[in-house]
Amino acid sequence: NVTVTANYTAKSGSGNKTNKSTGSGNSTNSNSNRRPNSTTTGNVSGGRTTVVIDKNGLSNTSVVSATVNGSSDNFVIKITESASASEEVVKALMAEYGNDISAIKYFPMDISLYDSTGNNKITDTTGLSISITLPIPDSLITYAGNNKVAGVVNSKLDKLTPKFSTISGVSCICL
């Protein structure tokens, strides 16, 4: 029962209502595997998506790619560590598996979409879909394809069905 977490905001329906999703996973790694502010650029139809990673425990960032479908604009996807994402993940894991989650390895991260400047968070994602490939977090590599991936929606796990692949010898999660 390993969970890798992603965090994104998606607008649903009409009006200003948004649904916030947070993925989960666990990292007890030291800072030696940190790639602060590492940047990878992926292609988008008619535009470019830049992925900025500022999170401990994600090595091999050269395999990161992302595509934003539904727009020809340029975007920045930021993968960061945030206390709020971590708290939401813990709450959702406890709701799903009980109060003792000490046996579960998880890796919480905040994955958010920004405009091309990287300063303005995109909250209305109507018509957009995002495909992203990330290396399996360092602390979860040994579990390979047995890893589970989820977001958090309304304080509950939203279990996702990723594909696992190997790119240049690096185990990856594709969503």
Predicted regions mapped to residue ranges:
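Surface-exposed interfaces of beta-sheet-rich extracellular modules
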Residues: 1, 143-144, 148, 152-155
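Feature for mature exported/ectodomain regions
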Residues: 10-146
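Short, exposed beta-strand/loop patches in secreted or surface proteins that constitute
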Residues: 42, 161-166
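Short, solvent-exposed loop/turn segments in extracellular or other extracytoplasmic domains
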Residues: 127, 165-170
